[in-house]
Amino acid sequence: MTKKYDLHCHSTASDGVLTPTELVQRAHEQGVNVLALCDHDTVMGIDEAKIEANKLGIELINGVEISTNWEGRGIHIVRLNFDKTHPKMTALLAEQKSLREKRAVEIGHKLEKAGVPNAYEGAKALANGEVTRAHYARYLVQIGKVSNDGQAFKRYLGGGKSCFVKAEWVDIPTAIDTIHAAGGVAVIAHPMRYNMTGKWIRRLIVDFKQWGGDGMEVADSGQTKDQRQYLARLANEYDLAASLGSDFHFPCGWIELGKNLFLPEEVKPIWTLFE
């Protein structure tokens, strides 16, 4: 039987809406055999997810999505199959947590000035872990300032808007070195979602490969066939393994755990590096 993989999804440990237990249950309902919980800059949900995965016969891979800075842009690096208790890993995640908290507080202050009372407290009440922009968006919907999350980003939280705070994250080489020290593999998350031209995507991949990166996401739930083939060609051209993941955050019509996730035959699957 061919295994069904989803190596990128989120829970309430970061900005997802399902608990780790609920997420694993939904993955099981969707026929997923191998799952990686990749919350933003935290591994706090993995132990809970693993308990449910063991009950349901799902193989759970340790994962985390690390926020990094590259050429003035925010780039996400997915870490897979690592020792989450490794000292270098725990130190980096502690640093990221501090940076994320600092940013969250600054966003709260800006929202207060923009006429949103108790913004930080309201967002924190919706968060199970670190406060993210997604939690602020949900709070803005809750109090009636906007009608949906997208409007919250367009009006307040998106890049260049009045309450946007630029993040200060680690650089990519530091992220990769920490991943390797903990025995894992480093993967560029969703390369097509950074609003970059093909030239800039190649520059990112070249730097990532030069710094020791292992793979890139080639398949996700919402892409076109042409996008998948394009990313597969880049993975082969730069000798990177190919990963796949829905980047599931909440139930919706267009993104689902395990949905439309398969790799073109010509690529090297990332799980071949797990042994």
Report each predicted region and the residues it spans.
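Extended substrate/RNA-proximal surfaces in nucleic-acid metabolism proteins
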Residues: 54-206, 261, 265-269, 274
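A short acidic, helix-capping loop that chelates divalent metal ions and anchors anionic groups
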Residues: 88, 253-254
